[in-house]
Amino acid sequence: GGDTRTTVYQSPHPLYADHGKGCRLYDVDGNEYIDFVNNHTSMIHGHAHPKIIGAVQQQLEKGTAWTAYNEHTIRLAQIICERVPSVEKIRFCNSGTEATMMALRAARAHTGRSKIIKTEGGYHGSHDAVEISIIPDPRLLGPIESPASVPEGGAAIPKGVLSDVVVIPFNEPDLAEPIIRRNASEVAAIIV
């Protein structure tokens, strides 16, 4: 309890921020930090950038939140499709967790296969299919040539989900390739 994001929780208590400016973050005790996390890289312009504040204020005058598409949604989708030729369609999501959940569901629907492959140590959101082997207990890792699927933090992830997640070692292509080949006929997606 007491925290809105499990990914930032630190024992005995997480950092409590008061405000940020540029690349600096200030906590409730007045300590100053260089913010290397930047909201998990979504804050590429830093905190309280004047142009961002201006754009947000301008939009707030039009309305705060709609459950409808708008011209900005359409334009952003067009820009992404123009810049990434292989992208033909866009589906916007509320979070990275929702995005990976929907991507894996689409891959499973498209292929008719249930397994996914993920890298050991890779974070892809907070749902059962990807909360596996993010920071696994070293005693449970298994051999490097065949890493075990370890539920994150002892999470109550169903055994069926665990058996559908194949873990490959990070940045070890020679070790990952045989694992991928062994499971290829059952794999819907590889998430990196």
Annotated model-derived regions:
Residues 18-20, 37, 44, 94, ...:
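Short glycine/serine/threonine-biased micro-segments
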